[in-house]
């Protein structure tokens, strides 16, 4: 037997080369895929594999596949090709193992050669070989002579019994499988028969039901059918006659071989079509009768209508055309298009008018269900008052609070002014007070309004030396709108120019009456610098809180309001929340406006971690999905999944409202498009450190817009300036304004590459002033006419070059050459042009001053004596935005 390589052996036994090399290595033989394998190495490998398996296999299984193609005739004379694959599997068993002989003496057992799997395989595959037959007989003879055959036969017998048991089980399993398949096929056939029987019965019923209508239709067309039958019969007879004549002419000329060839060349499809034609001609002619069941009763549907619905969607739910819905609305006196959105009441009237049942659905059902499924306590306890400090900018609000808290907050504010809402709670001898410090700048109106809404008492700080200012009046209006009591703190009382009585008189004009003058507002004279009157102010606040009898539920799920929110680079979205009811715990699921999340961490105003927060306690929470809007209500809920759905619903609703507000009438859009070329736009990308400052700056910038220059906020947000902001600014030709934020290195490189305008600010004054300057540069210049001289015409001369030359006397100002002029006659402008020639004693001059005679040439115009020539110049005036 020739040696083979490892690779060819692997292909022969259908295994991978790497696996065969590993098996050789496990058997103690080092081989590569190009090495040859001897017969002894094969036997050694086989013995190793037998030892691993624990048994010597005495079976050989052969598999064979045969493929064939079957052509099946289908309806219409066409043939269908079906591919058939037959798989056969046969197992051969070594007879020397299955038929053990009588036991032999044990002494001769050593003389028996070892029979391997390779030997069995060779004998099974080469039964016809005479050499193999002699070898088999020799082996059997050796077995008979062996004295130890008894033990070997016993082992082989046990193996045979195990194999026969295995074969029996496999046969039983296959028979059970065939039985199950037959059962499934039988059930499928029965179901198909049942469905066919039902269809047949239904067809019989329908035929009986509509037989009368069909009979009437047949009677109406019977004449035409009969005529067509006679025509077809005559045509068939004529065709048969022609075909018979043709066959009789060619019958004698065709030979047997030609007939056979024609028959073979005729396709099977043609013969099938011919048979079909013959069968069709033998059948009686029938009229094709088809009919459809017209619904006689209108279908009443249950139509679910939300708060708003479009006409097309309403028609789709009622399964009617949109035109029918529009007709029904016109009958009710409402005009609408198919894409128009109508309200719930109108849709209900239309649907009920068309005979459908209406089910009204509130779109905020999920939100209401989520809010109702909350644990709220019933036991109320006294809570600390929430005090908002309001007043004009630089009147000492933060300094006053700074003295109360004994910290240096005011020195840390940019520009010395507050630009955020700060929330702090202070422990005093008489109780705890929560303070909200609001900005006093005019741009932070919305932030002051939020502070007034979330507060119990307003402390109005007025500087004794400055009196009532615009933001002081605005703070009074916010307090009155929120129906909150006001405690007036007259600050800077230590200054020499302080005048508290003037402050009282000015506040009386705006509805703030002091107690000593018969009103209900307490006036406390304080000095945030030296600490005068601070204790009196705290006592006044606590006294006012006792009068209000402030109570809140301490147990149960918490409710609160967002005071401020911002995006921290390391911690993510952070919201400053003032708890109003219940207890906010770490790990609670909160719904906050358009955002939701789980409270991952809570910190107080000092930056320390806390586990829970009760009523009137401000905390910073981490874990929201995004930066929330300041002023949003914070609610603790049970289900995070439902909270997410409610947040997404709110976002979609807000988007719809925003789009509806942005949509203008067609007439306004038409006028806007006509004025587009006249209006300049200043595009701005705004980034701020907190949400409240971002909103305040947006409102302040939009108020700067004029009829000629419009401020357009392309993008705004909270957090640092990113590459996305720079890309947006480059695409829209906008400037980037950063308020208390910075750009990272990658963004700065992009800004330099795109040559963008990036500016940083920490004080809102500077930001607004520079934006005003940029807007002033975009204004179109203004031109004015300035009269620089007057000349009276004393005489007129003729010139061949210029025509009429006016001899003039300069009576006012000076006359410049090449300046625009007007000719006035009886104080009426009759000509406007340019001064062509200016001479003095026949010499060309550039200008002539007052009291000097000169000659003025006016081209192509007839100047008369006593006319007045007015010389002027056009001056460009630079415009600014106030």
From Swiss-Prot:
Sections of the chain in a coiled coil: none
Compositionally skewed regions (Basic and acidic residues) per UniProt: 137-172, 229-246, 263-276
Keywords: Cytoplasm, GTP-binding, Initiation factor, Nucleotide-binding, Protein biosynthesis
Region annotation (G4) ranges: 491-494
Pfam families reported in the protein's UniProt record: EF-G_D2 (PF22042), GTP_EFTU (PF00009), IF-2 (PF11987), IF2_assoc (PF08364), IF2_N (PF04760)
Disulfide bonds: none
PROSITE patterns according to UniProt: G_TR_2, IF2
Cell location: Cytoplasm
Annotated region described as Disordered, given as residue ranges: 95-176, 229-289
Domain tr-type G: from-to ranges: 382-551
Compositionally biased residues, Basic residues: 247-262
Function: One of the essential components for the initiation of protein synthesis. Protects formylmethionyl-tRNA from spontaneous hydrolysis and promotes its binding to the 30S ribosomal subunits. Also involved in the hydrolysis of GTP during the formation of the 70S ribosomal complex.
The protein, known as: Translation initiation factor IF-2
Organism expressing this protein natively: Hamiltonella defensa subsp. Acyrthosiphon pisum (strain 5AT)
Encoding gene per record: infB
């Amino acid at each position: 037997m020739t040696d083979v390589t490892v690779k060819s052996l692997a292909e022969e036994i259908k295994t991978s080369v790497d696996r065969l090399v590993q098996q050789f290595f496990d058997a103690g033989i080092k081989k590569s895929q190009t090495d040859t394998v001897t017969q002894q190495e094969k036997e050694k490998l086989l013995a190793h594999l037998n030892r691993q398996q624990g048994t010597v296999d005495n079976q050989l299984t052969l598999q064979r596949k045969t493929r064939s193609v079957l052509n099946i005739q289908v309806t219409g004379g066409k043939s269908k090709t079906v591919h058939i694959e037959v798989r056969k599997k046969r197992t051969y068993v070594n007879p020397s193992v299955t038929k053990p002989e009588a036991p032999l003496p044990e002494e001769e057992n050593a003389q028996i050669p070892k029979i391997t799997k390779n030997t069995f395989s060779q004998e099974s595959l080469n039964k016809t070989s005479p050499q193999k037959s002699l070898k088999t007989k020799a082996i059997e003879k050796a077995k008979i002579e062996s004295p130890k055959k008894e033990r070997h036969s016993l082992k082989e017998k046990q193996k045979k019994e195990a194999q026969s048991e295995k074969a029996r089980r496999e046969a039983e399993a296959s028979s059970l499988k065939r039985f199950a398949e037959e059962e499934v096929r039988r059930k499928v056939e029965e179901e198909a028969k049942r469905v066919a029987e039902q269809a047949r019965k239904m067809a019989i019923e329908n035929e009986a039901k509509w037989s009368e209508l069909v009979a009437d239709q047949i009677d109406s067309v019977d004449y035409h059918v009969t005529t067509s039958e006679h025509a077809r019969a005559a045509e068939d007879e004529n065709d048969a006659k022609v075909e018979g004549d043709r066959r009789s002419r060619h019958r004698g000329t065709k030979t047997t071989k030609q007939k056979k060839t024609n028959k073979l060349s005729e396709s099977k499809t043609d013969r099938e079509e011919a048979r079909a034609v013959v069968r069709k001609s033998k059948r009686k002619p029938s009229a094709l009768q088809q009919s459809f069941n017209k619904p006689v009763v209108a279908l009443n549907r249950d139509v679910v209508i939300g708060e708003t619905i479009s006409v097309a969607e309403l028609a789709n739910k009622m399964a009617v055309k949109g035109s029918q819905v529009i007709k029904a609305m016109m009958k009710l006196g409402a005009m609408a298009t198919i894409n128009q959105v109508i309200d719930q009441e109108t849709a209900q009237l239309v649907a009920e008018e068309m005979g459908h049942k209406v089910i009204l659905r509130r779109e905020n059902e999920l939100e209401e269900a989520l809010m109702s499924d909350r644990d709220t306590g019933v036991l109320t306890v006294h809570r600390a008052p929430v005090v908002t400090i309001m007043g004009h900018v630089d009147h000492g609000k933060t300094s006053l609070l700074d003295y109360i808290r004994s910290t240096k907050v005011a020195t840390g504010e940019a520009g010395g002014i507050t630009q955020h809402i700060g929330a702090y709670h202070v422990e005093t001898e008489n109780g705890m007070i929560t303070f909200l410090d609001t900005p006093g700048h005019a741009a932070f109106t919305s932030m002051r309004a939020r502070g007034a809404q979330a507060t119990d008492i307003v402390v109005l700080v007025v500087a004794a030396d400055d009196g009532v200012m615009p933001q002081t009046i605005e703070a009074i209006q916010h307090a009155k709108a929120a129906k909150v009591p006001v405690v007036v703190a007259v600050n800077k009382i230590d200054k020499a120019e302080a005048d508290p009585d003037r402050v009282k008189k000015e506040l009386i004009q705006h509805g703030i009456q002091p107690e000593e003058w018969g009103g209900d507002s307490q006036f406390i004279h304080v000095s945030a610098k030296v600490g005068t009157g601070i204790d009196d102010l705290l006592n006044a606040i606590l006294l006012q809180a006792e009068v209000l009898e402030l109570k809140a539920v301490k147990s149960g799920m918490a409710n609160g309001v967002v005071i401020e929110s911002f995006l921290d680079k390391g911690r993510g979205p952070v919201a400053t929340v003032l708890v109003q009811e219940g207890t906010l715990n770490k790990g609670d699921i909160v719904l906050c406006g358009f955002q939701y999340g789980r409270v991952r961490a809570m910190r107080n105003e000092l930056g320390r971690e806390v586990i829970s927060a009760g009523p009137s306690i401000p905390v910073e929470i981490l874990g929201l999905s995004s930066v929330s809007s300041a002023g949003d209500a914070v609610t603790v809920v049970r289900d995070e999944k439902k909270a997410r759905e409610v947040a997404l619903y709110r976002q979609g609703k807000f988007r719809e409202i925003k789009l509806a507000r942005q949509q203008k009438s067609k007439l306004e859009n038409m006028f806007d498009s006509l004025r587009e070329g006249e209006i300049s736009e200043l595009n701005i990308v705004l980034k701020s450190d907190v949400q409240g400052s971002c909103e305040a700056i947006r409102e302040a910038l939009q108020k700067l817009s004029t009829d000629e220059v419009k401020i357009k906020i392309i993008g705004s947000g909270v957090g640092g300036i990113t590459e996305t902001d720079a890309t947006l600014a480059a695409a829209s030709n906008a400037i980037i304004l950063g308020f208390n934020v910075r750009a990272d290195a990658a963004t700065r490189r992009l800004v330099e590459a795109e040559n963008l305008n990036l500016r940083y600010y920490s004080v809102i004054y500077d930001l607004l002033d520079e934006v005003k300057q940029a807007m002033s540069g975009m204004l179109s210049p203004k031109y004015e006419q300035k009269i620089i001289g007057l000349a009276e015409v004393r005489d007129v001369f003729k010139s061949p070059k210029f025509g009429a030359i006016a001899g003039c006397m300069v009576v006012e100002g000076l006359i410049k050459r090449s300046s625009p002029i007007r000719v006035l006659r009886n104080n009426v402008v009759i000509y406007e042009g340019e001064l062509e020639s200016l001479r003095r004693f026949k010499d060309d001059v550039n200008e002539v001053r007052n009291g000097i005679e000169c000659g003025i040439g006016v081209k192509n115009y007839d100047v008369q004596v006593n006319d007045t020539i007015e010389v002027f110049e056009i001056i460009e005036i630079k415009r600014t935005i106030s």
